[in-house]
């Protein structure tokens, strides 16, 4: 029993498998058929769209041709509006024509139906006569201009040359001369220009004389100002000492004055006078302190840059040494009163002399950029390496223990 049931189940299963296989094949065929139908539908739709586009273009061309034919003339439109005969016209059945051929035929009929034609622009006799008259007038004007330009040129050539003028006149009349040459000279304007030139000459001569007088006055006033700045010099019997720096400067520029030793004193009732000696450097341009205070600087020689006071130049001031070393002042040595040190202060100053000497020596070393002699080693023997490498404090502590 069990085997029969199993066999039946197997037969049913085989039949079912056959049915399923057949259905699958049918479904595949149906799908292929659907795809082919969809493709045909797409082709038909594409043809329909193209046909609609063609029909639209044909309609547009027909409408254009109708508009052209209607806009030709009112007479042709009135004739066309007449009622046509009732009899039907039998049109011959021929081959179908394209829209282009129809448009060409309609354009030909429209061109034949036109009664008025636009006149092309052409040159008439009146226009040519006006052109010839204008050309004659222009040629006559050009000839008259040429003649008028030749006349002033001849007058300029025949005009006598003026006498030579001074530089001040030439500078004064530069603008007027340029304007006279640029403009065209007429016979009425020539007399005016000659009068203006004479007036300008007289005015320039007056101006030149005035400027010369002003220059002489200014030079004399300047000389008077500069002459007032002189100082009392030494008597003529005094000997003049010439320094080498003064010689070198005088060879370069001869305007540098000779060094003069100045003296200042106050006469008493008996006629005796006191002379104060002032320290004078080698520079001959500034022999005393009062000179730079009272000197008048000329505007031509003064420059906008202030000289360097600390610069090493031959014309440095006497104030360079002030403030650099201890105890230096601007007063001369003759006015300084040296006090003699007392016996009590000698012992105090003796102890401080060594420290001052060391300070002065170090300062001179720094100023002269040389090392002091105290840096020199006392012996040339090299120290032992044992003392260098070992710690002295630890060694001493061990030795004490």
UniProtKB/Swiss-Prot annotation:
GO biological process, one term: male meiotic nuclear division
Subcellular location: Chromosome, Centromere
Keywords: Cell cycle, Cell division, Centromere, Chromosome, Chromosome partition, Coiled coil, Developmental protein, Meiosis, Mitosis, Phosphoprotein
Region feature Disordered, mapped onto this chain: 82-197, 338-401
Phosphothreonine modified-residue sites: 331
Coiled coil regions, renumbered to chain: 3-49
Effect of residue 28 to D: In mei-S332-3; induces missegregation of chromatids during meiosis
Modified residues (Phosphoserine): 124-126
Subunit and interaction comment: Homodimer. Interacts with Incenp.
Name of the protein this chain belongs to: Shugoshin
Designated gene of the protein: mei-S332
């Amino acid at each position: 029993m069990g085997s029969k049931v199993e066999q039946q189940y197997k037969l049913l299963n085989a039949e079912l498998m056959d049915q399923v296989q057949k259905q699958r094949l049918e479904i595949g065929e149906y799908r292929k058929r659907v795809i082919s139908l969809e493709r045909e539908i797409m082709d038909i739709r594409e043809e329909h769209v193209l046909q609609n586009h063609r029909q639209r273009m044909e309609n547009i061309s027909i409408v254009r041709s109708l508009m052209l034919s209607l806009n030709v003339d009112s007479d042709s439109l009135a004739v066309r509006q007449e009622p046509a005969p009732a009899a039907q016209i039998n049109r011959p059945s021929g081959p179908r024509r394209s829209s282009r051929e129809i448009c060409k035929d309609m354009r030909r009929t429209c061109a034949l139906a036109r009664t008025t034609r636009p006149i092309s622009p052409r040159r008439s006799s009146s226009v040519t006569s006006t052109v010839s008259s204008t050309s004659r007038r222009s040629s006559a004007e050009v000839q008259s201009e040429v003649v008028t330009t030749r006349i002033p040129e001849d007058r300029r050539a025949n005009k006598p040359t003026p006498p030579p003028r001074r530089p001040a006149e030439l500078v004064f009349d530069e603008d007027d001369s340029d304007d006279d040459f640029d403009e065209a000279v007429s016979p009425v304007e020539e007399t005016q220009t000659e009068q203006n030139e004479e007036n300008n000459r007289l005015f320039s001569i007056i101006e030149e004389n005035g400027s010369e007088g002003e220059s002489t006055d200014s030079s004399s006033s300047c000389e008077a100002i500069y002459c007032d700045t002189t100082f009392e010099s030494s008597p003529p019997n005094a000997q003049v000492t010439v320094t080498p720096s003064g010689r070198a400067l005088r060879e370069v520029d001869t305007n540098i004055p000779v060094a003069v030793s100045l003296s200042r004193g106050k006469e008493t009732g008996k006629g005796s006078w006191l002379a104060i000696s002032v320290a004078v450097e080698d520079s001959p341009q500034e022999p005393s302190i009062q000179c730079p205070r009272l000197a008048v600087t000329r505007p031509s020689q003064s420059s906008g840059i202030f000289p360097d006071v600390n610069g090493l130049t031959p014309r440095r001031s006497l104030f360079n040494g002030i403030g650099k070393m201890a105890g230096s002042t601007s007063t001369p040595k003759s006015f300084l009163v040296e006090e003699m040190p007392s016996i009590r202060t000698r012992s105090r100053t003796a102890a401080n002399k060594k420290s001052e000497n060391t300070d002065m020596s170090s300062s001179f070393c720094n100023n002269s950029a040389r090392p002091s002699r105290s840096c020199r080693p006392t012996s040339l023997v090299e120290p032992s390496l044992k003392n260098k490498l070992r710690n002295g404090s630890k060694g001493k502590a061990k030795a004490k223990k």
